[in-house]
Amino acid sequence: MVQKTRRRVLVAGALAAAGLTVAKIAEAIPTGKLTIALVLKSLADPFTVAMASAAQNYQKHFASQFDLNVLGTSTELDTATQIRMVDDLIGAHTSAIVLAPTDSKALVPVVARAINAGVIVIAIDNPLDEAALDALHLSVPFVGPDNRKGAETIGDYVATKLARGDEVGIIEGVTTDRNAQQRTEGFKAAMDAAGMKVVAVAPGDYTYAKGKAAAATMLAQHPRLRALLCANDNMATGAVDAVRLAHRTGSVYITGYNNNPDIRPLLNSGKILATVDQFAARQAVFGIDVALKALTEMTRQEDLTPLVETPLQLVKSGDR
């Protein structure tokens, strides 16, 4: 099922990149039926695929109530394409947009255009920048976990494996994303509380390659490094390979974030110490549910509950 879903969303993403997506999809939407669009980040990320799959399964149970368009970008940083997607969805008279922003600030202007056009907008996974929203007198609900709390939880666990004064590095996500910023804040808070030394912080943009490169640089510059706290599992996987190439396997703890299925072997082997499950499927479904409820109850954007917090769970090496 996941593979079928991935093929469908990849096709949608490719059409969007060509500027063809919503105009074509809109032709197939029955007149008067509610339409909800799920606009995601990189379709190459298993976390995004899990969101897409869950959303489409959810829609099947409520097909008489609404149609669902699932769109996504080719990379984590493809903000221009995501902005174009939202503009196209406005033009297609979409009822609601559930958005996982590629950039917490850069998406705010197009979100404002959507709201001003009468489209309900909900943010999931990555909250929009509060100051940018406030400047435009907008409110966009965030459906998702407390990223700082999740990062603190995993940081606290790592600290139990370390000695006070040990050196650690942090590999961040996309630095313009609020969720990445919150995870870095949480990692730092946990390390400070435990008396560890954060000797390096570098972005890995949520990708394997950049996570590996950031880890390699930290390992070369800080030979006494004892842990690498990574803001997602893709970067943690890259860090595992960087540690192996540096002949440091077993002496550097590595953590991830998301609990993607791909890292289960690394957790089982102990190469990744722990990750955080933020339940991608639930985030997508809860976001759509909030949008659908707003539409059916005709709730105004400004009257929507600003935060719907979703669960987190620490997943440790050896857990079954």
Question: Language-model segments: which ranges?
Answer:
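Hinge/cleft segment of the Venus flytrap/periplasmic-binding protein
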Residues: T31-K33, I171, T175, N179, ...
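Flexible loop/hinge segments that line or gate small-molecule binding clefts
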Residues: S104-K149, T160, E167, N258-L273, ...
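Hydrophobic alpha-helical
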Residues: L99-N116, F187, V199-A200, G204-P265
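Extracytoplasmic "Venus flytrap"
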Residues: T35-A54, Y58, F62, N69-I83, ...
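C-terminal segment of N-terminal export signals and the immediately downstream linker at the start
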Residues: M1, V22-I36
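N-terminal secretory signal peptides and thylakoid transit peptides that target proteins
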Residues: M1-A16
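Hydrophobic alpha-helical segments within soluble ligand-binding/sensing domains
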Residues: Q82, F142-V168, K210-K212, N259-I263, ...
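Short, solvent-exposed amphipathic alpha-helices that sit
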Residues: F47-F62, G150-I154, R178-K197, K210, ...
